[in-house]
Amino acid sequence: MKIDMRNISKSFGTNKVLEKIDLELQSGQIHALMGENGAGKSTLMNILTGLFPASTGTIYIDGEERTFSNPQEAEEFGISFIHQEMNTWPEMTVLENLFLGREIKTTFGLLNQKLMRQKALEAFKRLGVTIPLDIPIGNLSVGQQQMIEIAKSLLSQLSILVMDEPTAALTDRETENLFRVIRSLKQEGVGIVYISHRMEEIFKITDFVTVMRDGVIVDTKETSLTNSDELVKKMVGRKLEDYYPEKHSEIGPVAFEVSNLCGDNFEDVSFYVRKGEILGFSGLMGAGRTEVMRTIFGIDKKKSGKVKIDDQEITITSPSQAIKQGIGFLTENRKDEGLILDFNIKDNMTLPSTKDFSKHGFFDEKTSTTFVQQLINRLYIKSGRPDLEVGNLSGGNQQKVVLAKWIGIAPKVLILDEPTRGVDVGAKREIYQLMNELADRGVPIVMVSSDLPEILGVSDRIMVMHEGRISGELSRKEADQEKVMQLATGGK
């Protein structure tokens, strides 16, 4: 299959997001699509797969003009899109999620459970994963849910597969399994559109790379004929002098301390963070890092242990109590737990600090709007009108809104779980700079990240977890990838 997208433009009201795009996609090729959040990558692929129409332009498939009125039509034609944010129903089982809208029935009109199970297990086998079919999908980790999204696409007869940040929540082993599947699909003649911000993946897996910026295509090249510096410069329109900005904050006394904390999937976790310090938490998926942070914030119940702020023990049994104590928590799954997508930017940003803008029982609209606009300007949130629905923002800008929400409470401690997941290189640097500014003000920061270069580049100290326990601590000077991975896998 050959796809030619010609002169594609798209506007939402007065906001032009794509302008005169020409793009060719070919079966049997892996084609990377790169660009900052808001560059138009996902919008372009949504037009291809029928989620919404182009304002102008034409799509040719094997020389014939064709458009799809919805994604299901595109899937039936052999074009599938795995979105960055997972399209799952938490209460339904894995099997029900896999076959939702594509149920297989017997000649009597009943669900063919046997055949659906067989096909599901075949898809999992190709991915190299083992996931129970009869448990609610909401009980699974983000990484496992992502693998199920990928497995869905394998249930169809594929010609073109679009993947938007498919490895964002995957372990190294799951990523290697995914690459194996991608290479296998390529050998079968399937074309892959691979949207990613991860340079190492682009150079490892793709044949061609197209860079987008501000709704236009900047360049298309064979991947082997370019390099990461060139791609970054084309993506952001400027040279990034240092990927991780230099940190100048003075580290003060201990401000936040956790002692012998035990929960459902971890035990005896102890650590401390000083004023102005960024403490990184590393480990493999399933090591228990997120569970520790959720327990500290009162989302999950603790079994035992103590939490102190400024040497005073505090009791937290709910997120509202955590917020009152001055703890901010950016969760790893922003759309389910960090944002209300139907609310506008202002309402999302002021959710935890509503009382701060209330006088005599009345909400001070003027003061809150001014405050929110300052945050929008400071965080460079694109299309950032306070009244704009958060669901209309790109992933990177949504992440900035969540960050702004917690900055608004003037936190005594800030916990960030995968703060740059699915965020482009330019927005990542802006988030790092913001973290440094908060540290300069003395805010202690705990950062959970599966991005090892990020852990090494941003953290003052690093705690490593393995199978629910702290397996080691490393200073910034002594830490390197080998030492972190050794501790993450249970070594000493």
UniProtKB/Swiss-Prot annotation:
- Entry keyword set: ATP-binding, Cell membrane, Membrane, Nucleotide-binding, Repeat, Sugar transport, Translocase, Transport
Reactions listed under catalytic activity: D-ribose(out) + ATP + H2O = D-ribose(in) + ADP + phosphate + H(+)
Q: What class of enzyme is it?
A: translocase
Provide the membrane topology annotation: Peripheral membrane protein
- What GO MF annotations does this protein's record show? ABC-type D-ribose transporter activity; ATP binding; ATP hydrolysis activity
Q: Where in the cell is it found?
A: Cell membrane
Family statement: Belongs to the ABC transporter superfamily. Ribose importer (TC 3.A.1.2.1) family.
Per its record, how is this protein called by name? Ribose import ATP-binding protein RbsA
Lineage, uppermost ranks: Bacteria, Bacillati, Bacillota, Bacilli, Lactobacillales
What gene does this protein come from? Answer: rbsA
